[in-house]
Structure formats: C-alpha cells, structure tokens
C-alpha cells in the first residue's frame, strides 16, 4: 500500500512538472490564436515593424561636416549599433563572451539580464508581470518586461486607461500586455538583438527633451554615444526610468 502511495505521489509530481513546463507554450499558442482572430484588436503589421516611425530632428550640417543646428518636435537622432562602440577597444565591455558598447551593457544589466537568451518574452518573469499588472494595477514598464517588450510599447504605445472603471481598466491592461508580448515576438523575428538594443536606445526619452541616446549624450555630457564611459552610460540608462521634464 505504501509503495502504491509513493508511486502515486511521484506520478502527481511528474504530471505537475509537465504542466508547469508546457504552460508557457500553451499560453503562447493561445495568444497567437486570439491575435489571429482579432480578439486583441489591431496589431502592428509586418510593414510597420520593418519601418517603425519616430519623430526625428532635422539636422543642419556646416561645410566642415559638423551639426550647426537642429529643428525638432522631439529632439531625436538615430544612431546605428556599431556607432555605440568606443573607438578605444579597451573600453568595450565583454558580456556573455561578446563585446558590447558600455551603454548596451548598462542597459542589459539594468533592464533585462537575460536579454540575449530569450525570444522577446522572459518566461520566468511572466508570473511577476501578471501579479504586478493584474493584481497591483501597475502598468509601468518595470516588473519583468524585457527590452524587446519595452521597445514594442515605445513604438506602439498603449491606449490610456485612466478614465476607465476598475474592471474595464484591468481587462484593457491584460489585453495591452498580450499585444505587447505578441509584438515583442514579431520584433525578435524581424531584428537581431543588436538592432533591438539600438532601436530601444533610439526611441526612449531621457528627459530635458532629449529623445534617443545620441541626443541624450549630447544634452547631458556634450558627447557622442561612442564617447560615453561606463558611469555616464549607466546614468543615462537610469534616467530612462525617471527622466527629468
């Protein structure tokens, strides 16, 4: 009798382990199915994902090739991933066996330590995200959102929920989170990790009307992104979560 009970307990444990292991994949399949059926409303098209729109500043160059003025609604200029690397290779940061720019290393360490290992969604953080978003009614970009999810939210902002009732607000936040996950998966499919990191740094606001890492580096330190040291890069990444206005 005792042997049967032991086998029964082991069987239940194995079953529970399988349920835990397969639940994320079942959730992903459900999300994609509901998205295909239009339950989450309009999703960004592949064309929009391949050519995201942002307000860029118009830069005026002098004969010497230097910027002499800008016109903008948002002070934003794009920079490529390769242009984030310091000219001195000794200033490069080694992360996971790869050289990365200091500002990208600071971003990963601060926002998404498993950035290079997931496909847009950090499965171990799903439960924390669920508790924070649904139970605590906290819609901030922290609490487990990956860099790719935050990029999805920056490129395709959520609808406001301030004037909704509690139930309606909760349902809208859940719907927005599902859309954010699906968009993150699509971004990971369309872009490399390096491109995603650069896009994120180019789209976020750093305060003082500085949008994008190029404008932020110039505004706060009078430098280009490749001239930032580790401390300056860490400060700019930290400012993203609490920018000055």
Please name every model-derived segment:
Residues 1-63, 68, 134:
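N-terminal type II signal-anchor transmembrane helix
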Residues 61-245:
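Peptidoglycan glycan-strand catalytic modules in the bacterial/periplasmic cell-wall system
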């Amino acid at each position: 009798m005792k042997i049967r009970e032991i086998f029964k307990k082991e069987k239940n444990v194995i079953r529970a382990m399988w349920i835990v292991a397969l639940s994320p994949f079942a959730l992903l399949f459900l999300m994609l199915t509901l998205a295909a059926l239009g339950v989450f409303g309009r999703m960004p098209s592949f064309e929009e994902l391949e050519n995201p729109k942002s307000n860029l500043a118009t830069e005026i160059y002098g004969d010497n090739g230097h910027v002499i003025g800008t016109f903008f609604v948002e002070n934003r200029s794009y920079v490529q991933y390769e242009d984030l690397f310091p000219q001195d290779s000794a200033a490069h940061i080694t992360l996971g066996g790869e050289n990365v720019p200091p500002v990208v290393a600071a971003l990963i360490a601060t926002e998404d330590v498993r950035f290079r290992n997931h496909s847009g969604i950090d499965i171990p953080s799903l439960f924390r995200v669920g508790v924070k978003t649904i139970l605590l009614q906290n819609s901030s970009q922290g609490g487990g959102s990956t860099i790719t999810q935050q990029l999805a939210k920056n490129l395709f902002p959520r609808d406001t929920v301030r004037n909704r009732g509690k139930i309606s607000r909760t349902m809208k936040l859940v719907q927005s989170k599902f859309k954010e996950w699906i968009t993150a998966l699509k971004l990971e499919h369309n872009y490399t990790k390096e491109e995603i990191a650069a896009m994120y740094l180019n789209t976020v606001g750093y305060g003082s009307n500085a949008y994008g890492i190029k404008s932020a580096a110039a505004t706060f330190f009078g430098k280009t992104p490749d001239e930032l040291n580790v401390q300056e890069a860490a400060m700019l990444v930290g400012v993203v979560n609490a920018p000055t206005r």
